Amino acid sequence: MLICNDKSNPKTLLEEIMALRPWRKGPFEISQIKIDSEWDSSIKWDLVKNATPLKDKVVADVGCNNGYYLFKMLEHGPKSLVGFDPGVLVKKQFEFLAPFFDKEKKIIYESLGVEDLHEKYPNAFDVIFCLGVLYHRKSPLEALKALYHALKIKGELVLDTLIIDSPLDIALCPKKTYAKMKNVYFIPSVSALKGWCERVGFENFEILSVLKTTPKEQRKTDFILGQSLEDFLDKTDPSKTLEGYDAPLRGYFKMLKPSKR
């Protein structure tokens, strides 16, 4: 949890926080008020925080949401930090949080998507984190290309995506929805993902972790509006989504942009 012992008026603060729902990423604590977000993002952060050193590096978080991971990255001493997310509400959440957790104003927040990266930030970053974005893209290869071209030579990509458990070079393409999400297009096997990354030009593809999503990590709270994981799974068989697909399984990976291609 990110904690800030500020002297703000708790009542006014809580009103501001609730007006910014739903809070997907967190948790945060400000003036003893806990923002109990839908996702316990510390679980994911613990899996990727030591993937590569961030000290004195130029770092990006693509799909940064409200900035939770950016604030955690500050603790590792990067040279600079840029977050990318086109969402309007999550930027408002970031603007609310930044005075508490980025008092030196080191973070740049860009309202841009992954498709904008290579044009606006070519060969710019030593490290890019892209967590929970790839399966939302209609063209995952184009998204990987954009990430590749935004990295410096010998830059590293830390990637998290939904995956399917299969030894084959295949991807699940949900017919209409996956776990009630309409914007999920391709969920690859690890082997298929490795092939995509290598076709784009990445090398040294490394599996950091594979983890099932559980109610400990994603659940309904008073700080979101609507449903969460428990509502997306089959009540009689939680190993399946409501649509009959395998329940969410996430892979965490690291790869390198080589010096020559």
Curated annotation (Swiss-Prot):
Coiled coil: none annotated. It catalyses: carboxy-S-adenosyl-L-methionine + 5-hydroxyuridine(34) in tRNA = 5-carboxymethoxyuridine(34) in tRNA + S-adenosyl-L-homocysteine + H(+). Keywords: Transferase, tRNA processing. The keyword Transferase applies. GO terms for molecular function: methyltransferase activity; transferase activity, transferring alkyl or aryl (other than methyl) groups. It comes from the Bacteria. Its EC number is 2.5.1.-. It is an enzyme of class 2 (transferase). GO terms for biological process: tRNA wobble uridine modification. The keyword Transferase applies. Carboxy-S-adenosyl-L-methionine binds at residues 25, 39, 44, 63, 114-115, 135, 250. Catalyzes carboxymethyl transfer from carboxy-S-adenosyl-L-methionine (Cx-SAM) to 5-hydroxyuridine (ho5U) to form 5-carboxymethoxyuridine (cmo5U) at position 34 in tRNAs. Belongs to the class I-like SAM-binding methyltransferase superfamily. CmoB family. Homotetramer. This is tRNA U34 carboxymethyltransferase. The lineage of its organism: Bacteria, Pseudomonadati, Campylobacterota, Epsilonproteobacteria, Campylobacterales.
